[in-house]
A protein has these predicted regions:
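C-terminal helical/coil "lid" or tail adjacent to the Rossmann-like core of SAM-dependent
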Residues: 14-16, 197-258
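Conserved catalytic/acceptor-binding region of the Class I
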Residues: 105, 138, 142-223, 233
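A short SAM/SAH-binding and catalytic strip from SAM-dependent methyltransferases
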Residues: 110-125
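Core SAM-dependent methyltransferase catalytic element
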Residues: 192-195, 263-272
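A short glycine-rich, Lys/Arg-flanked "PGG" loop and its adjoining helix->strand segment in the class I
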Residues: 127-139
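N-terminal, positively charged/glycine-rich alpha-helical extensions of SAM-dependent methyltransferases
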Residues: 1-34
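Class I SAM-dependent methyltransferase SAM/SAH-binding core
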Residues: 51-101, 111
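Conserved alpha-helix/loop element of class I SAM-dependent methyltransferases that forms part
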Residues: 26-50, 61, 65
């Protein structure tokens, strides 16, 4: 339920979060939590790529780190808005709408990466989006998808209420409200003709009980729901005061109930 990059444009306003400078900080916190939980920036067995594409690059942090790992490669970050300042020399940012098709020819990219766009890409578009990712991938190259569930577990009262508000908002906007994207990542890849597909589920802790990862994830979700308060108010008639109280109660629940949030990582290889 945690929105990543590829934020809303004038044409596509389905992304649930409004634009705001603090979103840069939140997305970076999210990145650090995921990197630590996975133990790496990716799980696919990528070796010395010459061209890497990060779709929905957000702040660019993931791509910046790939630039450092593969200094001989060009890393391209695609998003509706520009990356943060300080990009490495081998980074190139492209502003484009994923839903209008990727602005690349067939078979160009060694490694295609896309993360946390289920709160930006309509459910009905997912199969076509993954097919387009496979199209631009070079034969023998790798595609990796990372997406989150639409629920927090256990769904304690305040936590469950916040998650339900998020799902209602997503449903209104044609986004995933049932976890179908989370559960279908490997199938999307297989149906796009990708082979050697693997899927890994990871349960991330929320709260200080979960150490550094839990602390980062709690900060991410606290910022997420705080940012969503005016959106909930406008779309669902929920007062800012109720949202504030729900967030406060939810933070207590995370520590008491050892709440977790699951992500799925699926990757595969484009056949030669």
């Amino acid at each position: 339920m945690d929105g990543g990059g590829d934020r809303a444009s004038d044409r596509d306003v389905s992304y649930v979060l409004p634009r705001h400078p603090t979103e840069v900080d939140r997305l970076d916190v999210q990145h650090y939590a995921l990197r630590e939980a996975l133990g790496a920036n990716y799980l696919a067995p990528v070796q010395r790529p010459t061209l890497v594409l990060d779709v929905g690059a957000g702040t660019g942090q993931w791509a910046f780190e790939l630039c450092a790992e593969f200094p001989e490669a060009q890393v391209v970050g695609l998003d509706l808005e520009p990356s943060k300042p300080g990009a490495p020399a081998n980074y190139r940012g492209i502003r484009a709408n994923l839903l209008e098709g990727l602005p690349f020819g067939d078979g160009q990219i060694n490694f295609v990466h896309q993360r946390l766009l289920f709160s930006g890409v309509p459910v009905k578009a997912w199969a076509a989006v993954v097919t387009d990712l496979a199209r631009v991938c070079r034969p023998g190259g790798w595609i990796e998808l990372v997406e989150g569930d639409t629920e927090l577990r256990p769904a304690s009262p305040a936590t469950g209420r916040l998650a339900e508000l998020f799902r209602r908002l997503s449903r209104i906007r044609g986004l995933d409200s049932t976890g179908i994207v989370f559960s279908s990542l490997d199938r999307y890849l297989t149906r796009a003709g990708v082979t050697a597909v693997e899927r890994h589920n990871v349960a991330l802790p929320l709260g200080e009980w979960g150490g550094r990862i839990g602390s980062l994830m709690a900060s991410d979700f606290r910022a997420l729901f705080t940012r969503l308060a005016p959106v909930f108010a406008a779309a669902l008639g929920v007062s800012a005061e109720e949202c504030e109280e729900l967030v406060r109660e939810a933070r207590e629940e995370w520590e008491r109930d050892h709440t977790t949030y699951s992500i799925a990582v699926a990757f595969g290889q484009k056949p030669n």
